[in-house]
Curated annotation (Swiss-Prot):
InterPro entries: ADH-like_C, ADH-like_N, ADH_Zn_CS, GroES-like_sf, NAD(P)-bd_dom_sf, Zn_alcohol_dh. It comes from the Eukaryota. Its cofactor is Zn(2+). Belongs to the zinc-containing alcohol dehydrogenase family. It is found in: Cell projection. The gene is ARD1. It comes from Uromyces fabae (Rust fungus). Its EC number is 1.1.1.287. This is D-arabinitol dehydrogenase 1.
Length: 349
């Protein structure tokens, strides 16, 4: 086992229970023969972390959160062959059992014992974090800030797999968060001849234009966008082949089906409050043969996400708008809640 001198303890963000977190000294994780220990350089913060803070999603407590982890390997088990000490890596945080009903049917995303570092297992809001070596991927050309976007990019790749857009598709993407902006770019790269991005006017849409995320942009009025939605329908009387709802807002997901073309697809892509409900007409779904598809997390999409970002085909310039120290995590949550940011990251030291 390759080694170097390591401290016995580390600084970590620790939740005892929902809404109850503190900065603590925790033991540096011990690794097994097939695992690596990372010195975390940065970890992204996303909407899922807000839901974890509230005790929603699939979170388990107590917990060290953080699921968009970048770091350098400082310790490797003696069975590790794919990476080595000194490699900068990003981490696929999903863990599956390989033996349940769904895993054996080749659909491990639905694993009955599904776990995720930073959600149900300890993650990257700490100075050190451990992962199975099979779940880490070296990066070369990405800054730490850019690398925080690999995990959400992998979710966008999975979303693309679920949509399977036909060449020449017309697509409407609602919401301009990080993973939505990357999915918009993936649609452009994979068959869509027209991508329309609709989101609230402000910083996110400004960045969307800078990275050329879409073909057309609709800057929605935050207070009253009713006329703009009506105009969108008038301008597109037959709707869109693909509609992606990426806001996580209950009222918008309810309305999004009204922009789907007959025979088209609605991708439910946002992270919603557990209490959110939809009231779609089954007759409309039946008569218009609308495909309603969910896209949750990802499995086996990291290599493609790394390749897209390393090549520059997916642009991420300026998407990380705020970086905080781990001790400033409450400020990070407050900034995210204010909607005055696009992507936030945390540095452990």
């Amino acid at each position: 086992m390759a080694t170097q001198t390591l401290p016995a303890q580390m600084t970590a963000l620790y939740y005892e229970k929902p809404r109850d977190f503190s900065i603590i000294k925790a033991d540096v994780p011990l690794i097994d023969h097939d695992e690596v220990l990372l010195k975390v350089s940065m970890c992204g913060v996303c909407g899922t972390d807000q839901h974890i803070h509230e005790g929603e999603f699939i979170a388990k407590f107590p917990l060290i959160p953080g699921h968009e982890v970048i770091g350098t390997i400082v310790l490797a088990g003696n069975q590790v062959e794919n990476v080595k000490v000194g490699d900068r890596v990003v981490c696929d945080v999903s863990e599956t059992c390989h033996k349940c009903f769904f895993c054996q049917r080749g659909t491990p995303l639905f694993c009955e014992s599904f776990e995720a570092h930073g959600v149900t297992l300890n993650g990257g809001f700490a100075e050190y974090a451990k992962f199975r070596a099979a779940k880490v991927f070296p990066i070369k050309n990405l800054t730490d800030e850019q690398a925080t976007l690999v995990e959400p990019a992998s979710c966008a790749v999975h979303g693309l797999d679920k949509i399977r857009p036909k060449p020449g598709s017309e697509c409407l993407l609602i919401g301009a968060g990080p993973t939505g902006l990357m999915l918009a770019q993936l649609l452009k790269l994979n068959g869509a001849q027209r991508v329309v991005l609709a989101a609230n006017k402000g910083m996110k849409m400004d960045i969307a234009r800078k990275i050329n995320a879409a073909d057309e942009y609709i800057d929605l009025d935050r207070k009253d966008a009713a006329n703009q939605w009506a105009q969108l329908k008038e301008d597109n009387p037959h709707g869109f082949d693909v509609v992606v709802e990426a806001t996580g807002v209950e009222s918008i997901v309810n309305d999004s089906i009204n922009y789907v073309r007959r025979g088209g697809t609605l991708l439910v892509y946002g992270v919603y409050d557990n209490a959110a409900r939809v009231t779609w007409s089954p007759t409309k779904i039946f008569q218009d043969e609308i495909n309603i598809v969910g896209s949750f997390a990802q499995i086996h999409c990291f290599p493609r996400a790394v390749a897209y970002l390393e090549s520059g085909k997916i642009r991420t310039d300026g998407m990380v708008t705020h970086v905080y120290k781990i001790e400033e995590y409450q400020e990070a949550l407050d900034k995210m809640a204010s909607r005055q940011c696009l992507k936030i990251a945390v540095k452990p030291n």
